[in-house]
Amino acid sequence: MTDVRIEHDLLGDREVPADALYGVQTLRALENFRISDFRLHHFPSLVRALAYVKHAAARTNQRLGGLEKAKADAIAQACAEIENGEHHEHFVVDLIQGGAGTSTNMNANEVIANRGLEILGHERGQYEYLHPNNDVNFGQSTNDVYPTAVRLAILLSFPDLADAMQGLIDALSAKGEEFNHMLKMGRTQMQDAVPMTVGQEFHAWATTVSEDVELSLIHI
C-alpha cells in the first residue's frame, strides 16, 4: 500500500499522506503559512464548533433539497465523530494565516469529506462521490463559517474560563484579606485621593471580575 495519494487542484497535482483525512488545500496551507506553532487541533472547542456548523448546514441543505440524503448522512456522521473528539489530529493548519480563515474552513471541509467518503464506502480523495466544496461547504463561505464557529467555540470554552476566573477571584480576595490593614493613597483623575487600603483595592478587583463573569453567564 502506497504511503501517499495524489490529489489535484487548480495549481496541479500534489502528494498527500495516504493516512491524512485532510487534502490538497490543507497541504498547501501547511506550506504557505508556517507562522506559529499553534495548530487548529490545539483548540478542540474550535474544531468541535466547526463540526457543529458543518453538521447543521448539511441537514439544512438536505431539507432544502440541495443535498441528497446519503451525502448528508455521511457528512452528519463525520461531524458527529469530530464533535465527540475524534479525528482532531487531522486539523493541522496554522491558526495564524492569510485569507481570514479560508484555510481553516477548507481543513474542516476536507477532513469531513474524506471521513464521509469512508462512511460511504469510498477511498479518501475520491471527491467525485463527496466533495469538500460542492457538498460539505455547500451554501457557505468562510465568512459564514469562521465567525460562527469562533462564537460557538467561545461559548463551548466558557465553563473552563469561568472556573479559571473563579480561581482568580479567590486569589484576589485572599490578597484583599492579607493586605486589609495596609494604607495607601487612593488615585483618581491622575492625582492623589482619599486614603484606602491595599486590601480594598484587591477586593475591588475581585468584585469587578466576579460581576463580569456573572454578566457573561446571563448572556450565555
Language-model features, listed with the residues they occupy:
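Charged, amphipathic alpha-helical oligomerization/scaffolding segments
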Residues: 52, 56, 74, 81, ...
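Short, flexible active-site-proximal loops enriched in glycine and acidic residues
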Residues: 68-72, 82-95, 119-143, 173-188
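Glycine/serine-rich anion-binding loops at beta->alpha junctions
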Residues: 21-22, 90-110, 137-146
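Alpha-helical scaffold segments that form or flank carboxylate-/histidine-based iron centers
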Residues: 98-102, 191-205
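A glycine- and small-aliphatic-rich helix-loop capping segment at beta-alpha/alpha-beta transitions
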Residues: 108-122
